[in-house]
Swiss-Prot record:
Keywords: Membrane, Transmembrane, Transmembrane helix. The chain crosses the membrane at residues 19-39, 63-83, 90-110, 220-240. Belongs to the tetraspanin (TM4SF) family. It comes from Bos taurus (Bovine). InterPro entries: Tetraspanin/Peripherin (IPR018499), Tetraspanin_animals (IPR000301), Tetraspanin_EC2_sf (IPR008952). The gene is TSPAN11. The keyword Nucleus does not apply. This is Tetraspanin-11. Pfam families: Tetraspanin (PF00335). Signal peptide: none annotated. GO terms for cellular component: plasma membrane.
Amino acid sequence: MAHYKVEQDDWLTVYLKYLLFIFNFFFWVGGAAVMAVGVWTLVEKSGYLGVLASSTFAASAYILIFAGALVMVTGFLGFGAVIREDRGCLSAYFCLLLAIFLVELVAGVLAHVYYQRLSDELKQHLTRTLAENYRQPGAAEITASVDRLQQDFKCCGSNSSADWLQSSYILSPEAEGRRVPDSCCKTVVARCGQRAHPSNIYKVEGGCISKLEQFLADHLLLMGAVGIGVACLQICGMILTCGLHRRLQLHFY
């Protein structure tokens, strides 16, 4: 009977090792996905960050990149800990899993807080940006962000093209008679903004605010979904790590 119990204990240890090894593979892939989402958000969509009043959106993406990179490094430690059956490495692996979980939790909270105030921030800041900062000295980044926003989303003005009538740029001689910036035009050519007819410029219900709000909401949802998926994996991993650590401890004694 004692011999059977020893064999059973050995099989439990082997079973836990295989489970943890499989988990670690998916965990490593999940880390790569988290980092990829963060990098993609910053690289491909950074052109819109200049029109946001808060840096929370960018901060969430940076945290995801950091967490993803840490996950991939931790994954290698996990493979080594399982293969070597080293309790010290397993303890370090568990601590890193817990640390990554907390980092992702912070990113999730930031994303949720930002999502709650997203609409109000856009309405206040984008309208003011168009009126006060577009084509003004020292505002080249904001100007480029607004131009890209209007061209990519095929919109004009924060709520409508009429918002540009309050713009310092449009009211200045520099505008050369433009009623909207050239980036509002369906086909951008020099001084095309002088003709603000629906056949020439984008007329979108809700303006650029509605388009940008939906875009940011979709990205926050994607970041949240990826983060939650990896966090669930981590909880499973911590449970398996504790189980294997306990089995190895019993074998040691």
